[in-house]
A protein has these predicted regions:
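Alpha-helical membrane-protein architecture signal
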Residues: 56, 60, 100, 124-127
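Interfacial helix-loop-helix junctions of multi-pass membrane proteins
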Residues: 106-130
């Protein structure tokens, strides 16, 4: 029962994440650009950048866009691997399935973006999205590994279980 609740929860998070990505891709070029400009403009205000502000905004907008791609796909990678880890498969298959699903979604997202006015598809974005997927998967596996090591260490420390000194 607990496994089913986890699966449903992670599946809902995958769907929400995918809908958000779809929404961003459906924005026309002007809307998308304005959102990036708003974010970098707020950053410039917080950092109190006056000198070379226009240059900062221009360069920063590109960085914000790439970080947005990476971040949203990192979260998708987290939800994908978390969902797939609820199934009893070898770890290498779980990682492969999560990676392939994430990359396929990134490719279809770029294809969808081609049909939004003022937007185009970019192989660079697919690469950044894929790196985000891999990073999300790696984060989850790292957290699980650390958790297991701490659990074993504490079990030994407090003599829980059948540990020998």
């Amino acid at each position: 029962m607990k496994t089913n609740i986890l699966r449903i929860t992670f599946l809902i998070l995958i769907i929400i994440n995918s809908v958000i990505i779809f929404g961003f891709s459906a924005q026309n070029g002007e809307e998308s650009g304005n959102l990036s400009k708003l974010v970098i403009s707020k950053i410039a205000d917080i950092l109190n950048i006056e000198e070379n502000r226009e240059n900062f905004l221009e360069v920063g907008e590109s960085i914000v866009r790439k970080l947005a791609h990476f971040s949203i796909y990192t979260s998708l990678g987290i939800w994908l691997i978390s969902f797939i880890l609820t199934f009893k498969l070898k770890l290498k298959y779980q990682i492969t399935i999560a990676s392939v699903l994430g990359i396929v979604y990134a490719i279809t997202d770029e294809f969808h973006q081609k049909f939004s006015f003022g937007r185009h598809a970019s192989i660079n974005d697919v690469i950044i999205d894929s790196l985000g997927i891999f990073f999300g998967i790696t984060l989850v596996l790292l957290v699980i590994t650390i958790y297991k090591k701490l659990k074993i260490k504490n079990a030994k420390k407090y003599k829980i279980g059948n540990w020998k000194k």
